[in-house]
């Protein structure tokens, strides 16, 4: 009877032993982190629609590493670093998530779908009533972006790479995804993964950060509304959205797909297209967000994240 090579029979274990202690430790850490994300999503501490599929994807991708025919380590989920057309077409017939990643994630389509869904939930009435207050709040939200650029540059990243990393500070996942594709495509995977981990952990830790940073006497202040918000007619909101979309696309063409998607969602909301509204605000938004979590999870491959060219981002 021939001896059974368990390392070959169970390749997940075999690749763990053959990959070196650094990579093996990273795989174990990411598996444990994935399990933690699943638990925190189940408890409702983090957003379950993103964190549960993301955590399960992290577990599966780091446990399911195998030895490919050419002797390298790989998986049967996807390869985000493919650029050759022939290799990409061959891989799309083998790796089951490669078509989803290539046709929706790496070209920004899934980000546009999410923005479209967000648009259906967005009431532009406050922006109409208080445009300057809205701009001020937006600038405050982007403070982290401006502060991160010089720090990233000091770590050796180029200006475009620094700008892509800095977008994480704006706490806008789809915008991070879209910007990294435009400015630093070679860092797209680690930037996107770090961004959504940061957003999820910030969401879960936000109440504790508020208690830590804001004195109790300020937290006890009750907000008083001096006057009731003005109710704008739907046609005013629709016209405002169309004009604002045109202006923003004219000023910032590189982000025009996101602007179009957002204001298309607003237009659906304000025009009374009930069936389209139900679809965009429901299945499209939640389905895209769920698949975003799945793809983010399987992109958390230890071998990919520990690449020397991407360590500085992580």
What are these regions, as identified by a protein language model?
Residues 312-313:
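Conserved small/polar residues in nucleotide/adenosyl-binding loops
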Residues 103-108, 115-124, 135-147, 151, ...:
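Alpha-helical membrane segments and immediately flanking helix-loop junctions
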Residues 55-62, 136-149, 169-176, 285-299:
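Small-residue-rich segments of transmembrane alpha-helices in multi-pass membrane proteins
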Residues 102-128, 265-268, 285-307:
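Hydrophobic transmembrane alpha-helices of secondary-active transporters
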Residues 196-273:
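Membrane-embedded hairpin module used as a gating/binding unit in multi-pass transport
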Residues 29-32, 48-60, 112-114, 192, ...:
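Hydrophobic mid-bilayer segments of alpha-helices in multi-pass membrane transport proteins
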Residues 1-82, 92:
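N-terminal alpha-helical transmembrane segments of multi-pass membrane transport
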Residues 63-98, 119-128, 150-159, 303-304:
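Transmembrane alpha-helix boundary signature
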